Design a protein with these regions (language model features):
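Non-heme Fe(II) oxygenase catalytic core, chiefly the N-lobe of the double-stranded beta-helix
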Residues: 1-210, 215-244
Length: 244
């Protein structure tokens, strides 16, 4: 069987159990105990690797009273809802996946109001200023250093054989053989189709919850967590295969 894989930036992994990746806005002695602000865009995990994670398991260790929900969308359903001309356009195409630093960007929740959006921008400015005054974060150090990966834009599920869109709203940066002026709007449109609000499942965490999902058939995003609401999540991912 496939094994558990550690997150590729070891600074964010639990020292006693390095396969566990820590996501948290909590700080100890002024330093973050995990990665803060990650995953607030629609994505499937580790698409910038040769063999992206097949399954993700997330454990709610400390759950905020406000924010920090996880939203899910079904990318197989999204593909099936596309019109025939769009399917013909994207079938057989390969998308370009690039690891980029994408922290404190926005909430993947389209329902965010202007007050919360302003709060997100304030937190983003604060975190970037903190980093500028110290050393670059491990994430920033790795930004754009990973090689680009080409994966099918329409992926066939390795178990069910069902076709699904395979994209990452921030790290899928283009389509092989297609001008960016055409590819980028197309990618954003496909993500919008997949994440139409009435097609999204919202999971509200309770302490101790564990959720597992299939990265070959879904995309997910975290919603914004206010900085005064502590959040600690432990993540495990299972090794995957080369997407086809």
């Amino acid at each position: 069987g496939r094994g558990i894989e550690p997150f590729f930036i070891s600074s964010y992994n639990l020292p006693t159990h390095p396969q566990i990746y820590v996501l948290s806005n909590v700080r100890k002695d002024g330093k973050p105990i995990g990665r803060d602000g990650a995953g607030t865009h629609w994505h499937s995990d580790s698409t910038f690797t040769e063999k992206p994670s097949s399954v993700t398991l997330l454990h709610g260790v400390v759950v905020p009273a406000r924010g920090g929900d996880t939203l899910f969308a079904d990318t197989a359903d999204a593909y099936e809802r596309l019109d025939p001309s769009t399917k013909a356009l994207i079938d057989g195409k390969r998308a370009i996946h690039r690891y980029q630093r994408k922290e404190f960007v926005f909430s993947g929740d389209r329902a965010v109001d202007e007050a919360e959006r302003a709060e997100i921008e304030r937190l983003k400015a604060l975190r970037l200023a903190e980093e500028a005054a110290t050393a670059p974060s491990p994430t920033a150090q790795r930004s754009n250093r990973e090689p680009d990966r080409l994966h099918p834009l329409v992926r066939t599920h390795p178990v069910t054989g069902r076709k699904a869109l395979y994209l990452n709203d921030e790290m899928t940066v283009g389509i092989e053989g297609m001008p960016d002026a055409e590819a980028v709007p197309l990618l954003h449109r496909l993500c919008e189709v997949a994440t139409e609000p009435d097609r999204v499942l919202r999971f509200k965490w309770r302490q101790g919850d564990i959720v597992a999902w299939d990265n070959a058939a879904t995309v997910h995003t975290a919603t914004f967590t206010p900085p005064d609401e502590p959040r600690v999540m432990h993540r495990l991912t299972v090794e995957g295969t080369v997407p086809v």
